[in-house]
């Protein structure tokens, strides 16, 4: 999984990490200048763009997992793992940008604490679950620790920026993506699946 699934899963995130590198000094500058409105604008905009970007690739990898794994590794059995982890892309990408933003706002120590906590939990979960449940235990550990890390970072970001984001926006966006995947997966041709997914996704998100 680490050598075959994660490279495909995280390859599109290179754009997110590039954005994160640009955000850190810009947020630090705005924070030092007391430009709270600019900080809130950047945070809100970055989260929206990252969520949309991640939903596009999450659905695309879910639907194209089999041809992708066959083309890259000549191994279709890896596709089931790529489908499983592709559902976590929105959280993983949003976590990356959130972590960068709290660092830019002077919360490096908190970021380190969160990472240390989740790493300790990860080791504990793997020690307890991996021998008994195998790949399933690894997925559970990965899911729980990343949810905790993202939850703590996101909560910290909202606290220091005093930004209020209605919960219905991310929930509706994720539900729209899940519905688009469900509808698209009922077609057999891969290009049609992706086009249908994007049409349904963007149609739903324009309602926000």
Spell out what each predicted region is.
Residues 17-20, 80-106, 110-130, 135-157, ...:
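Short runs within selected transmembrane alpha-helices of multi-pass transporters and secretion channels
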Residues 2-94, 98-107, 113:
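Specific pore-lining/lateral-gate transmembrane helices of multi-pass inner-membrane transport
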Residues 63-64, 71-72, 128-133, 155-160, ...:
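Helix-loop junctions at the membrane-solvent interface of multi-pass transporters
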Residues 7, 43, 47, 51, ...:
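Hydrophobic, aromatic-rich alpha-helical transmembrane segments
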Residues 16, 35, 130, 189-194:
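Intrinsic-disorder/low-complexity, polar/charged segments
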Residues 167-208:
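Transmembrane alpha-helical segments of multi-pass transport proteins
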Residues 34-37, 159-174:
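Interhelical loop/hinge segments that connect adjacent transmembrane helices in multipass membrane
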Residues 18, 59, 135, 190-191:
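Residue-level detector of secondary-structure boundary/capping sites
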């Amino acid at each position: 999984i680490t050598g075959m699934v994660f490279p495909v899963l995280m390859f599109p995130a290179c754009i997110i990490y590039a954005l994160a590198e640009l955000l850190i000094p810009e947020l630090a500058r705005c924070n030092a200048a007391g430009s709270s409105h600019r900080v809130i604008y950047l945070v809100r905009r970055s989260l929206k763009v990252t969520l949309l970007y991640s939903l596009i690739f999450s659905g695309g990898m879910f639907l194209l997992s089999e041809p992708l794994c066959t083309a890259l590794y000549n191994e279709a059995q890896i596709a089931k793992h790529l489908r499983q982890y592709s559902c976590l892309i929105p959280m993983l990408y949003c976590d990356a940008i959130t972590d960068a933003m709290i660092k830019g706002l002077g919360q490096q120590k908190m970021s380190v604490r969160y990472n240390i906590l989740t790493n300790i939990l990860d080791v504990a979960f793997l020690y307890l679950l991996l021998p008994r449940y195998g790949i399933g235990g690894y997925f559970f550990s990965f899911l729980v620790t990343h949810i905790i890390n993202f939850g703590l970072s996101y909560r910290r970001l909202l606290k220091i920026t005093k930004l209020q984001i209605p919960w219905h926006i991310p929930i509706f966006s994720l539900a729209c993506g899940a519905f688009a995947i469900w509808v698209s997966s009922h077609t057999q041709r891969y290009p049609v699946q992706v086009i249908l997914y994007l049409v349904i996704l963007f149609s739903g998100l324009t309602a926000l």
